[in-house]
Amino acid sequence: MEDCNGEDIIATPELPLEIIVYIQSFLQASDRKDASLVCRSWYYASQDFHFQKNLTFSFPASASSLELIKGLGRKSRCSLIIKQLDGFSMSRSLLMEVGLCLGSKLESLALPGSSITEASLLSLLPRLTSLRRLDLRGLDSLFMSGAFLSREEHRHQVRSALSGLEELDLSDLRYLSDLTFNRLTSCTPGLRRLSLAGCHIAFEFDPYRGCPAGAVKDSSALLSLRNLKRLVTEQRWTLVALDLSRTSITPDSLRTVAQVPDLVLEELRLHGCKELTDYSIEVLVKHQPSLQRLDISACTELTSRSVEAVAQGLKALTQLSLSRDWRITEKGLAELLSVSSLRSLDLSECLHVSGTEIVKGLTGCTTARAQLDTLSLKSCTYIRDFAVFSLTQLLGNTLRELDLTLCVNVTDLSVRAIATYLQGLVVLRLGLCKEITDWGLLGMVEATKCEPDQETADKGPRFTRTFGNMGFFKPPRLPFDEKPKLVTHNDLQQFKQQAGASLLALNRLQELDLSACPKLTDSSITQVLRYPDLRRLSLSMLPEITDASLASVACHCRSLTSLALSHCPGISDRGVAQAAPYLHRLQHLYLSGCSNITDRSLFLLLQHCDRLQTLDISSCKNISPTTVDLLQSRLPFLENVHHKFIETRSCYRKK
């Protein structure tokens, strides 16, 4: 081949498809989609089987979704989340298209926030022959009449299609009854996971008939314990996960379920079941010793006796949630942390936990102790620096997620310990830790920390000019009233030269929450927040940060999909103008209470952030409703726009 000058052109060889697939394996799904537009080879690579498994497409019901569904028909398999379906013709056409194009390829279907008719779903389900997961949570419109699947021919069609269904979510169904439950579950003989969270289940008493629950066979008004036990007994060989959260299950009812012969549960969720007692947990542990994941959060009657029972009886436990179990103390936690299989522990809002027994349990036998990768101590106000320092050393090799939100006694010492020992962290939450300052994030020690403060030095009593209060002396200044000591230019130069443990060391972070840490300023945010893989960042309620922080974060954290800057008075259009060109991946943006944000920022988002799904501009009084409407009409993926209190000014003008 020759060019216009008669010289030979050497053709550049194409990369092998396997190499392109390997390159794309390092990209996020959204970036891989953009890369597929480069050329045909890159498109074929993006369709590789490894990228298609566990792929879920989420979109609202609209006319434009019809073309999307037709395009998905070329994939070998996929999962769908379709929102806001109703009983009108467009939604019916959408479901029909799903059945025609994806019937044999669809693995999972969820219909949140929808109100569809029985006829629409019954025309779809017989076509979904490969379905493994069905989510019908909150679809009261299906069960209100009680006629769903009442005809034998419909049940036969659905049973033929759903014989391989493994997961069924029936959470928050107000009108679920014995009749409708039996009809539906008779079509799904091989269930592995069942969720009935938030359903109205009569465990002991039938309020409609004034008799014990289950006395009336196949009630058309409510779902009874007798019927639930029947299902668990019939499918005991396959059922491994059960969710009864937010129900009124009693200790006797839990024992009835746990004692079903040959039932071997691996996961049980009982969040918010406030009738449960320590005795019921002891019985559960005795009859279901193979449990690996247990959620007994917000069961407010439970005490440390339950913790001891779990520690002694569940030796295969990997995940445990005790969140909001307010009566739990330190007792039993040391023994719990000796369960070597434990990987995730949630103690958030356990107000009596100080961390002492956790440290004690982890410092026991090194061969038989928990290797935690997730630890939540949110709102454990007794947690102090010593506990955090010890935990970071003991869990340094395994911990990937740490939540210290509202641990008000945590200071810069804890931040430095985290930066030193937990360099594999992926998620770090420090929101509302009000004692954290720039010095902690920078990994430096404040120069004047050990010197007596002139303001607080004892100079004897000082009188005030106001004699009408309780006394004559000036009250001591409260710690949270003090302005943080500013980091100077010389301090920053020292930071750049030293090899101290700053938050920069956490270069694997994907989520960081520093909201409501009021002593943080631009000095640390601009120097430390430089994470190429960071996805979610919250800097809300930081009164000292300005546009400089926003611009720096956008420049150095270009993978951000969620950014929260609510109630940051120093953020303005100028910062958005500097940041928006770097935030192409942004999907969720929170700017409520940022009074210096105007219409100009919305036009910048329209220009640069076309993937935006959620926008919160509540109380941004310099934004006009007209611009909000324009933004909603132009951004194809924008689903949620919160704009309370922005019409105030225009309303006054009309008056």
Can you name each region flagged by the protein language model?
Residues 1-260, 265-272, 277, 281-285, ...:
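N-terminal adaptor-interaction module of cullin-RING ubiquitin ligase components
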